[in-house]
Swiss-Prot record:
Matches recorded under InterPro entries: Como_LCP, RNA2_polyprotein, Viral_coat
Organism whose genome encodes this protein: Andean potato mottle virus (APMV)
Keyword NAD: no
Site (Cleavage): Q413, M414, Q800, F801
Record-level GO cellular component terms: host cell plasmodesma; T=3 icosahedral viral capsid
Record-given protein name: RNA2 polyprotein
Swiss-Prot/TrEMBL keywords: Capsid protein, DNA-binding, GTP-binding, Host cell junction, Host-virus interaction, Inhibition of host innate immune response by virus, Nucleotide-binding, RNA-binding, Suppressor of RNA silencing, T=3 icosahedral capsid protein, Transport, Viral immunoevasion, Viral movement protein, Virion
GO MF annotation: an example: RNA binding
Disulfides per UniProt: none
Gene3D superfamilies: 2.60.120.20
């Protein structure tokens, strides 16, 4: 009982002391005194001995009952464990989690002011702060925290930008009064600004807890104009109901206390897939803020948490189980190069003084100002460039230049900026006129007897560069060019005739390449009818995967310009015609075209020549069709070729997207007609013209000047995706491949003779969505003009001996090891080029049988010019089954090197002697000098290849070597390589494609 009396005396003493403090401060109130007396009386009643003596027996009974309930729970757990075989600890964990979920709740995650600032605070100030009114003045060094300040609502379907308040508006109005007559005491202690240490954004979402809506907010400091400095952090989270998403920002920023300070920080909100009703609120936001006042004589003292975590992280998102959350922040660090580039100027002087000019003559005059500049060897600042001529003359004698210490070095005369501008003139070529930027010019002859397939020009681009033109010497002696190359062609032919020309640029060609409209159109090309367009301008990016090129780049890489006739003269001219051409260095920056066969691009620039559509003059119905299996070989009934875009598309099984076509009129402008273009299947050819026009179609008409029309067919024109390659063994009606149909709508008529010819080119596929890895078809359908390839022109290869273990490998080649006379030589060897697939063997009387498998990956390696990244290879070795395991002595060794010469050392060596069957895996990393890309055996930079030299010991026991290849995730290609045509079966009786001997 004595302990209770002592505690009561202490409580009454503290209460009396607080009452005296209130009287001293003038805040004493009888109503407050009465309420506090009631509270103390209630506490005394609870702690009295009489009440405890009455409640003690009940407390004991409740504890016993609780213990009994625990025993019952344990019995139920044992029973459930016995009946359902559930471990007891699982049920215990569930019970504990349930009890914890009942007792705990999600709290604010913002750190307290004490965690951010360690500003000292006395006991008297803590007691005194309890009795300060809300309108008190914020002082320097005072730590403040505000919870649940309203921010605003995130409205669906609208651009949402909300201001993040730093403190409530009512307190801001008290700190910054509207009247200038407000009485302010102790001015030095009044806070002039606040340091915002932490801001927590809480989003109360109105959406369903099971929705998939996501969104985010960007925390912006609007006092900065540069986005690099303004955007402080960004967070992304799921906007679904239930637990409120929270994000912590640590601005670490001082904000001046004034009107409008709550408008400085803003949240820019966005939702990527919101299906909420427009105009309704997705969520409403509130903010928790922790800050510290800063005055003239007191600042803030950060804690270790603030220094080590808050300043380092800048932002932190609260992650909940089953919810995606992410946050990023940005820092714009200062770099010494900025001082070199922009400099720093200090101006002083220029004060106005009263100067005596003569007796009783005075005038106001401004003294000369001086400038001190801190800069390196960079360009002059914009401020110095805008100074007027008069001011510049005045400052000539008063300007002082201060260089940083590390830049004060003695420079040779040739390193001075003036000499550099005179000698290092690498950028002036592209800034001149067309006359001064012309580097080549000449004439090409088009014979009057030109027919389809006539090659007007096909040669190296370096051979066209002149020596006497104004821009040619400068171009030849410039190390780097970073802009496009522009071709200008002019010809004036009568409009009563017409001819179709194709101009193409390709990065490189093989020795026995084919020059026609199918091969030269794959990289950079344009279709031209001089009768419709007298002047043609054509720009290309010479380096498809790098930023620079030069004259030596043309000479040593084999860049090629080709011009061929794709449609003959509509009316034969009386003489040969000449095309005047000229080449200029353009001022447009280059664009790179890099492709990854494992990751489909959003836009695939196919640039595939679909063929010529020939319509006879008359009123009869005429229907033409072209298949859209763009991964197959392209050509006509005589030749077929593969190009880099075709090989890239063939890497996937199925495709769908928006197909963009270009229609070019190739005949005379006098021959006119209206065409309909639409998508349909092959079995729809039995429909009448009236039924065919019921398909969603596009009208194609040409004007007399341009002669071009563009047509697009989106995904809505296709029921589903279709195969990129179609087997020639499948009949046309069962291929399931959509066709581009072109139908004459009315009539084809003219006052002159001739057919109405239209060229069709597939430019690109937008929203390209392929799926599935395609190992390839041994029998691939060849696309023939106006029809699909028949079975008689199918492509055959040597029979496949084995298949890959998983469907991510492409077959490379197969070799049948010959039988040798072991008394003379006990080994056999062959070489395989891994980058440009070719096989070479030491015949010397041996019957080698080997073939390259026409898989999409092999075609991609052959037709792509530049390559970089990893390639994975697999060799399956199959021995002869009639050799006993105990008698097996055959070995296989693979030496991978950069070139076939003996002076090149091995990069990879693999050896095996396993009997009967084995598998060898290895990989190579292609890395070249052109932005990481490498060209096969190019003189430019002495670029090489990757060769695999295989030596077989005791080859009589060896049977078959089967090679496979697979691209790595970082493998990329660029540029088209014009290759030789594919060998069609039945012409030489070999039945192989192609065979290298």
């Amino acid at each position: 009982m004595s302990e209770l009396i002592v505690s009561d005396v202490v409580a009454l003493s503290v209460w009396g002391l607080l009452t005296v403090v209130k009287v001293y401060q003038g805040n004493f109130s009888l109503s407050v005194l009465f309420s506090e007396a009631q509270t103390l009386g209630f506490l005394f009643f609870i702690s009295c001995h009489w009440l405890q003596s009455i409640l003690l027996p009940w407390v004991v009974k409740i504890k016993c009952a609780t213990r009994f309930d625990i025993d019952l729970v344990e019995m139920e757990m044992r029973a459930e464990k016995y009946l359902n075989s559930i471990p007891a600890n699982v049920l215990e964990d569930r019970a504990k989690a349930y009890n914890v979920s009942k007792m705990t709740s999600i709290k604010n995650q913002i750190p307290s002011g004490k965690a951010l600032y360690q500003n000292g605070k006395s006991l008297a100030s803590m007691i005194k702060s309890q009795f300060q009114p809300i309108s008190k003045v914020l002082k320097g060094g005072e730590v403040k925290s505000y919870n649940y300040i309203p921010v605003g609502s995130f409205t669906a379907g609208e651009h949402c930008e909300l201001a993040v308040p730093i403190m409530p508006e009512e307190e801001l109005a008290a700190i910054v009064p509207d009247s200038d007559f407000a009485l302010v005491t102790k001015e030095d202690n009044k806070a002039k600004s606040v340091h915002v240490g932490a801001v927590e954004i809480v989003m109360e979402c109105m959406t369903s807890p099971d929705c998939d809506i996501y969104g985010g907010a960007m925390f912006v400091d609007t006092f900065h104009e540069d986005p690099k400095n303004a955007v402080r952090a960004l967070f992304v989270t799921q906007l679904k109901g239930g637990v409120s998403p929270r994000c912590l920002f640590f601005p670490d920023t001082q904000v001046e206390i004034k009107k409008g300070m709550n408008e400085r920080f803003r949240l820019i909100l966005s939702s990527g897939n919101s299906d909420f009703k427009p105009g309704e609120n997705l969520a409403y936001l509130k903010a928790n803020v922790a800050m510290c006042g800063i005055s003239m004589n007191k600042g803030y003292v950060p804690t270790a948490f603030h220094e080590s975590y808050a300043r380092k992280e800048r932002a932190s998102v609260i992650e909940y189980l089953g919810r995606y959350s992410a946050v990023i922040h940005h820092r714009n660090e200062f770099k010494p190069e900025m001082l070199k580039r922009d400099g720093l100027s200090f101006r002083f002087g220029g004060k106005t003084k009263l100067i005596e000019k003569g007796p009783l003559q005075y005038e106001w005059s401004e003294t000369a100002s001086k400038v001190v500049s801190v800069k390196g060897t960079g360009p002059p600042t914009k401020e110095d460039e805008t100074i007027s001529k008069e001011v510049s003359e005045t400052l000539g004698a008063t300007e002082h230049v201060v260089f940083p210490t590390r830049n004060v070095v003695a420079q040779a005369q040739m390193e001075v900026a003036q000499f550099g501008r005179l000698l290092d003139d690498t950028k002036s070529l592209k800034l001149q006129s067309l006359l001064n930027s012309r580097i080549a010019a000449g004439r090409f002859s088009i014979p009057m007897t030109a027919v389809k397939g006539t090659v007007v020009f096909d040669g190296l681009l370096a051979s066209l560069i002149g020596t006497t033109l104004r821009g040619a010497p400068m171009f030849r002696h410039t190390y780097r060019q970073s802009t496009k190359l522009r071709f200008i062609f002019t010809i004036n032919v009568p409009i009563s005739t017409g001819i179709g020309l194709m101009v193409g640029y390709n990065s490189v060609t093989s020795d026995k390449h084919l020059t026609n409209e199918y091969t030269i159109s794959s990289e950079e090309s344009v279709v031209w009818n001089p009768a419709c367009q007298g002047v043609l301008e054509f720009s290309v990016s010479p380096n498809p995967c790098g930023m620079y090129w030069s004259y030596d780049y043309f000479r040593q890489t084999g860049s090629r310009l080709s011009i061929c006739v794709i449609s003959p003269w509509s009316a034969t001219p009386t003489t040969d015609c000449a095309v005047a051409w000229q080449i200029h260095v353009d001022d447009e920056q280059m664009t790179m075209s890099i492709f990854n066969p494992t990751q489909a691009p959003a836009v695939l620039p196919v640039k595939r020549w679909m063929g010529n559509l020939i319509f006879k003059q008359g009123a009869q119905e005429q229907v033409k069709k072209m298949p859209l299996a763009i991964g197959a070989a392209v050509g006509d009934d005589k030749t077929a070729v593969m190009t880099m875009p075709n090989s890239l598309a063939a890497m996937w099984n199925y495709q769908i997207g928006t197909f963009n076509f270009e229609f070019t009129k190739l005949s005379s402008p006098f021959i006119k007609g209206t065409l309909l273009a639409f998508i349909a299947m092959d079995q729809d050819v039995s429909y009448s013209l009236e039924e065919l026009q019921n398909f969603p179609n596009k009208i194609v008409q040409f004007d007399e000047k341009d002669g071009r029309a563009y047509v697009s067919f989106g995904e809505e024109h296709f029921a589903q995706a279709w195969s990129t390659q179609v087997s020639g063994a499948v009949t046309s009606a069962k291929r399931g491949c959509p066709y581009l149909y072109v139908v004459s709508k009315d009539c084809i008529a003219s006052t002159i003779c001739g057919d109405f010819q239209v060229g069709v080119k597939l430019l690109s596929i937008e929203n390209y969505s392929p799926c599935g890895y395609n190992p390839g078809l041994v029998v691939a359908s060849t696309i023939v003009q106006n029809t699909a390839g028949s079975n008689s022109t199918s492509l055959l290869a040597w029979p496949q001996f084995c298949s890959p273990c998983i469907n991510v490998w492409s077959e490379f080649c197969a070799l049948d090891i010959p039988v040798v006379d072991t008394t003379k030589v006990n080994f056999a060897q062959y070489s395989l080029d891994l980058v440009n697939p070719t096989v070479s063997a030491n015949a010397s009387g041996r019957n080698w049988r080997f073939v390259l498998i026409p898989s999409p990956m092999v075609y991609l390696l052959q037709t792509s010019d530049w390559k970089r990244g990893k390639l994975h290879f697999k060799l399956k070795i199959l021995g002869k089954s009639n050799v006993k395991r105990s008698e097996w002595s055959s070995t296989s060794r693979i030496d991978v090197r950069r070139a076939p010469g003996t002076e090149y050392l091995n990069a990879i060596t693999v050896f095996t002697a396993e009997p009967h069957a084995d598998e060898i895996n290895f990989e190579i990393e292609i890395c070249g000098p052109n932005n990481g890309f490498e060209m096969w055996n190019a003189d430019f930079g002495n670029q090489l290849s990757w060769m695999a030299n295989v030596v077989i010991g005791n080859p009589d026991q060896a049977g078959i070597h089967q090679w496979y290849v697979r691209p790595g995730e970082n493998f990329e290609v660029a540029g088209n390589r014009m290759v030789q045509p594919l060998a069609l079966s039945g012409e030489d009786g070999t039945g192989m494609l192609p065979i290298l001997k």
